Structures are given as C-alpha cells and as structure tokens.
Amino acid sequence: MEAYIYRTLDVEEESFAALLEGANGPLQHLRFSEGPGVSLEQVTAWTRLASTSSGELETARIFEVIDQIRKQADMVPDAMVVLLTRTPHAGHWFSLGEGNSHYMHADDWNLFTATSFRLPVTYMLASNIIMRGMYDSMEELTCRAHQQPRGCLLDLSWPMASYPLSCLGMPFPL
C-alpha cells in the first residue's frame, strides 16, 4: 500500500526526508512518498486559506484541502493521501483521518517527547494507515474496540467475558 504525503513549507525538507526514510525502513508492506502533482507552495497556500483567524485548521477544512489535493493531483479515490503540516488542528488533535484522507500535525511534539517530530509522526502514520486497513471509520473502530470485543487483542484465546477485571484495565472488582 502506498501513501502519498503532501507537506506544507513549514515542514523542513531535511526533517521530511528523514521521516520518509524512517517510515519506509521497517514497514515493508507500507510505502510512503512525497505526493505528486501539487507543488509545496500550492499545498501551503490552500492550508493557509483553510486556517481560521487564529491559525488553526477545523476538521472539515482539513478534508477540503485534501480534496483539493486529490483533484489537482488527479488521484484515484482509493489513494491514501496525508496532509503533513505544522498548522495545528483547532481541536488539538495530532492526527486524524477518515477513509483514505489523513492529517498529521508536525509541531508541538516536543511538549510530550524529547525526540523530534519524526518518530511520533512515523508512528502515527503507520498506526492510522494500518487502522484504516482494519476499520472503515472511527465509528467502526469504536464499536469493535469497546462495544463488541471478542477477546484480548494480545491473546484471542479467551472470550472477553471470562477475563479477570484486572486484565481489562480495572484494578478493582465491580
């Protein structure tokens, strides 16, 4: 599976190259590359135009930018497209996605980790895209993870109802 990453000018070329190298290293079944057909300047302009007066991106506007990218790049509908920018999400999400359209925030990771954004963004890229292969929407993920669990993800040999509560993250009996 190939994922095309479109970055804005505020994501430095050197950091982006290191991100691609890191993401493409251990993940042989996923390939990440810089998206074709749309210039860096155009992606940046669309992202700035979509931003609120406080310089943030609302969820709906993120997907509008990605739709513009898809249209100009003449992407097939099932192509995986990622918008990577230092422009923050208005709800303070580091990443979000719906279907084959994803947003990754490349800034403020230093508030949570001592590494550059490359490691956490590589993790988010992989996990979001792998999750997309498993679930069609966040609603389905929520349903499968919280409402219809079939057992422990780490050991599917037990039905969920027979697990001790401490294994389910509950330190005390109900």
Tell where the protein language model's regions lie, with residue ranges.
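Active-site recognition of the HExxH zinc-binding catalytic motif
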Residues: 104-144
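A short acidic, often aromatic-flanked loop/helix-cap motif at beta-alpha or helix-coil junctions
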Residues: 39-45, 89-90, 109-114
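Active-site-proximal segments of metallohydrolase catalytic domains
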Residues: 43-100
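Short glycine-rich, low-complexity/disordered patches
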Residues: 32-40, 81, 134-145
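Propeptide-to-catalytic entry region of secreted or membrane-anchored zinc metalloproteases
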Residues: 1-68
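Metalloprotease/metallohydrolase-associated module, dominated by Zn2+-dependent proteases
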Residues: 96, 140-174
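Short, solvent-exposed secondary-structure capping/transition elements
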Residues: 14, 90-94, 138
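Structural motif
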Residues: 5-12, 82-87, 107-108
